[in-house]
Every structure is written in structure tokens, then in C-alpha cells.
Amino acid sequence: MAENDGETIVPDEQCNLTASTPMKSSGLEQVESPKERKTSMVECDDEGNPSSGTPDESPKQLTPHSIPPRRRRSPRRPEVSASRLPLKVLNQIFQYLPLKDLRSAMLTCHSWNNALSMEDSDIWQYLLGKKLPEAAVSDPFLLAELGSAKKKLRAWYFAWNTSDISRNNYIRTNGFTVHRQPVAQSTDGVRGKRGISKGVHAFDITWDGPLGTVAVVGIATKHAALHCVGYVALLGSDDQSWGWNLVDNVLMHNGAQLGVYPKMNNPPKYEVGDKIRLIIDCDTHVAYFERNSEFLGIAFNHIPPLRLYPAVCAVYGNTEVTMVYVGSPQMG
């Protein structure tokens, strides 16, 4: 061992350590711990950093308190649509609709159609009580042949028109009867509220009181006259009306007599209380009458396709004529 300036130099052979000799590690250093082994298997990204998906060191222990409660599914409610509304709800809604909208509602779906097809349902009873005058409701004979509330309400919309009438006539409080005031040298008429231009329609007409010299029942357009001076068959006096004079059983149109009606020898005269049914067939352009359910034959044919109204004219003072719309008549 040599000394150099007080420093002790150990030869390489004695140290047995050279730059080329690898350093031996202990056996403990060669064994990888589980943590190191696990870390060595971790995948890295391109930059050498552990990926975000590095698993935790130890799995979490699940406890009853750590498990989130399951959400209970609420029972599935049926879908609510207008076509599934209860009948009571529909009746409450339909009460506020006019007739034209009710007709549209009947064409909307089967449910609404079924609700409105019941002619005595609450909706029709409500509308009937709202529209029909008390005098008509309390009369046991006026609408006796109309069984349902819907038919009675429809008859009201086809009754005499208070705004389309001679100045010497007025409509009674029941809405279905016209009264002629005792005015001399005057012929006075009245038209129905609604005109018709298609389909078959029937009107029951009853004359209450003496007929006088002129008592005509028939049809007229909107342009036919409803008043004139003197006692004349006003209905049938021009090309806008067709009339049957119950006094002499003569048909009139355009100021000309078309013959006796019904076409038989010595036809029976009208008697007070007889029910005359006027039937207008707009599809075949004819009109005819029945008396006490007896068919009297075709009265007018080749009627032009115009909007027609039921009409009457009278000359006798204080006479009254009642008209009730019955809808489409029973054929055959």
C-alpha cells in the first residue's frame, strides 16, 4: 500500500471493482414487490405517462350503504287523447258548440260520433232546454210525434221565421204557430227559417181556424212575395212560388192554375184539424202532399234546383197555421 500525499490509494485488483464490472445487487433488491409488478404492467401513452385508465391499487369494498338504491318505475299511464274522453266530459264540451261545429265533431272520430248519435243524450237535452221556448216545451201535443230531443231541436231550427213574415202576421210564443191579425183586404204569408236544396224533407202543417177565400200552402224561394193587397192566392202568383189552395183544391204556379189536386173527381175538401204533410224531394225535383197519412199524388214536378222554403199565405182574421219539421219521411 503506497501513500501519496497523505492519501491512501487502494489498487483496483484489491477492490475488485472496475468500470466494466457490474454492480451486484442483493437478493432482496432482485425480487419485485407486488406493487412494483403491478405498476410495471401499467400501459403508458405515447409520452410515457400512465394512461387515465390506471386501475386503483385495491378494489373498493361494496357495502349495503354504498349501493345506490334502484329507481322504482312508475306505472305506465294510458295516453290521454280527445277520442278517449269520457262521455260526461264530452257532453260538457259539446254544450258550448254551435250546431255546425257539432256536425263537424260527428265526423271527427267514432267516439264523438257515438256520443252525438244518441238523440236523447245530455247534450241534446241541454241544447233543447236552452233553445226551445217554454210554451213549446209545455205543449203536450205540439211535438208529440218527435220522440227525441235532437229531433225537437231540429224542428225548432226549421220553424217559422220571425224575420221573414208579412207585417200583418206574428209568430206565437211557441215559435211554431203563425197568427194572422184581422186586417181587411190583405193577403199575408210567412216562410220557414231554413231553405233546402238537397235531400227529401217533410213538414207537418195544421190549419187552425176558418180558411176564408184563400188558404194556400206550398213552397217558395227567398224572392217570393209575402204580402199583397186584396184576397189572392199569393203563393203561386209568380215564378218564385208553388201553392195549393185548400179552399178550391187548385194548384198554382207563375200565376196560372195547374189543375185540381188531388186528381180525382170531387176531391174532398180540407177540414179544420186535418194534418197536411208537405214533402219536398230536391233530388228528383218534385213536391207532393199527404193528408192524414194518405198520399195525394205528385203536385209539382220539374222544380228548378233552387233553395226552397216551406210557406203559407192566409186572408182570414185570427186564423193560425202550425208547422213542424219532421225530417226525412218514411218511404214505401
Curated annotation (Swiss-Prot):
Keyword hit for Heme: no
Specify the pathway: Protein modification; protein ubiquitination
* Span list, region Disordered: 1-82
Q: List the signal peptide residues.
A: none
Q: Which residues form the F-box domain?
A: 79-127
Complex and partners = Component of an SCF (SKP1-CUL1-F-box protein) E3 ubiquitin ligase complex composed of cul-1, fsn-1, rpm-1 and skr-1. Interacts (via SPRY domain) with scd-2 (via cytoplasmic domain). Interacts (via SPRY domain) with convertase egl-3 (via C-terminus).
Protein name as it appears in the record: F-box/SPRY domain-containing protein 1
Name the species this protein comes from: Caenorhabditis elegans
Source species taxonomy: Eukaryota, Metazoa, Ecdysozoa, Nematoda, Chromadorea
Gene that encodes it: fsn-1
